Amino acid sequence: GQIDFQAPDEGTGTDAILKSASIQAVSEGDFSSSFNRTSLVLNTARSAAVGSAGDGGKLTLRSNGSMLLKDMRTDANAPSFILQTGNTNVAQDDVLGAIEFQAPDEGTGTDAILVAANISAISEGDFSSSSNATSLVFKTGASETATTKMKLSSGGNLSLPTDSVELAFGNDSDVKLTHVADTGLILAAGGQTTSDFGTP
């Protein structure tokens, strides 16, 4: 089935009276006694009838829960997904937007249903006419609601706030740089310590 949106009586005519948007339920294959997979497709138009090649945008929600966002224009444009806050007075540590990852229906419950990972944009201070300083914060959880493990500041500084954090390099992680709380850094290769950068 399909729902179309149109302004057929628009006085300016031409593009203005064409179908400008649609919602479609589209089969993902031949229906059978064991198959009725269907995608929900939202189409928008810019200067042609909705669904025309090379025009408008398309959002598809598939039966497996995946989502596809496509800019249908052919002139090298790329689609964007924008998270906006309605906050009119952004202060320090306000979350401007976040993406969370969770398995809320996991049968074992407890920790299993908590937010397992999170990517947030968090303000570094009060916004003003000359400042919108924001950090991108990456959170993960092991047996907890996800907590901050890495932060990229507005100035480009990368911080890893967890003690004993380890950076691994190479396909086999054969070179590792490990932080030791209140001590310094240890550089190891092939399981052997090669350098120890202690605090002064």
Regions found by a protein language model. Name each.
Residues 28-31, 124-125:
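Outer-membrane beta-barrel proteins
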